[in-house]
From Swiss-Prot:
Organism from which the protein derives: Shewanella halifaxensis (strain HAW-EB4)
Name under which the protein is recorded: Tetraacyldisaccharide 4'-kinase
Pfam families: LpxK (PF02606)
Positions with a binding annotation for ATP: 58-65
One Gene Ontology biological process: lipopolysaccharide core region biosynthetic process
Enzyme class: transferase
Keywords, in A-Z order: ATP-binding, Kinase, Lipid A biosynthesis, Lipid biosynthesis, Lipid metabolism, Nucleotide-binding, Transferase
């Protein structure tokens, strides 16, 4: 399914023209919804603390989660106490739920499980971000909120909007859903505070971000880990993220010998039997997002590659200066 969608959205498949009328309808509905909020006919809830939206205008992975983790660490160093809210993609949540370190990804969502495992940040997930934000403020010592995704969730007023773009895929064929990958038109990029480009090359006015490998870590928390992956031994690599090829390319650039690669759809659930068959006793490597879904049954020779987002000092300074102004005005 994912490979077919990639052909449609990123490789010029002619079927996109047949879907164009549906894209026009989708575009009208999203435009009308935004207009209703901008005119005040639909109300956006304002919070007593600054709200940062980390989102995108395309469907699929672009690097939002590493960006959220980067922001959490940046804000903490600046003396702030961030909290995070998320929809919890792909899971059914009754009301609002706190995400705890060790929670299963199939209960709270892949990205929330990964964010909390890495940062132990106060984080709530729920279908209604407003409810999650209000509960976060009432139950935790938080003075700034980061929304993981939610750029198009206009019910929540925001102070800063950060859009993450895949620097290699950019906007694909430039068409709205379902003919293309866009949730909103390219014009939306002109209305956000920063466009952050993950990989590739940022254009003028955009912010360059790179994902730098930091360490090999064992997937399992139950076994004593053996030796981490070596560049002298063949590996089996898997990835169930928005752009799996980026992970495989990273391994190649680092000089690892990848014997076999296996892609899964983004947000796939994994079974022990499928991954055991894939690995067949060999060393299996994966992304951090995949690892949070495999910990309960991982073998001691399964490893994930932790990566850290890197952005410029000038971006940090601009962002923190705006946050300081917002805090003073709240």
């Amino acid at each position: 399914m994912q490979s077919w969608v990639n052909k449609l959205w990123y490789q010029g498949h002619p079927l996109r023209f047949a879907l164009w009328p549906l894209s026009l309808l989708f575009g009208f509905v999203t435009w009308l919804r935004r207009v209703l909020f901008s005119l005040g006919l639909k109300k956006a809830a304002k919070l007593p603390v600054p709200v940062i939206i980390v989102g995108n205008i395309t469907v699929g992975g672009s690097g939002k989660t590493p960006t959220v983790i980067y922001l959490i660490e940046l804000l903490r160093k600046h003396g702030l106490k961030p909290g995070v809210i998320s929809r919890g993609y792909g899971v059914e949540i009754d009301g609002v739920r706190a995400v705890l370190s060790g929670d299963r990804a199939d209960s709270v969502g892949d990205e929330p499980a990964m964010i909390v495992a890495r940062t132990q940040v106060p984080m709530l997930v729920g279908a209604k971000r407003i409810d999650a934000a209000n509960l976060l403020l009432s139950e935790f010592d938080v003075d700034i909120i980061i929304s993981d995704d939610g750029l198009q969730h206009y019910q929540l007023a925001r102070d800063i909007e950060l859009v993450i773009l895949d620097g290699e895929r950019r906007l694909g064929n430039g068409m709205l859903l379902p003919a293309g990958p866009l949730r909103e038109g390219p014009w939306r990029l002109q209305n956000v505070d920063h466009v952050i480009v993950n990989g590739g090359k940022a254009l003028q006015g955009e912010v360059q971000m790179t994902l730098q490998p930091s360490a090999w870590l064992p997937v399992s928390t139950k076994h004593n880990a053996g030796e981490p992956p070596s560049k002298d031994s063949p590996l089996v690599a898997m990835a169930g993220i928005g752009n799996p090829q980026r992970f495989f390319d990273t391994l190649a650039q680092q000089g690892y010998q990848v014997e076999h690669t296996q892609t899964f759809d983004d947000h796939s659930a994994y079974s022990e039997s499928v991954l055991n068959e894939l690995a067949s006793g060999r060393m299996l490597v994966m992304t951090e997002k995949d690892a949070v879904k495999c910990r309960d049954f991982a073998k001691d020779n399964w490893w994930y590659l932790a990566v850290d987002a890197k952005l410029s000092a000038s971006f940090d300074q601009q962002l923190l200066a705006k946050i300081d102004r917002l805090v003073a005005d709240k």
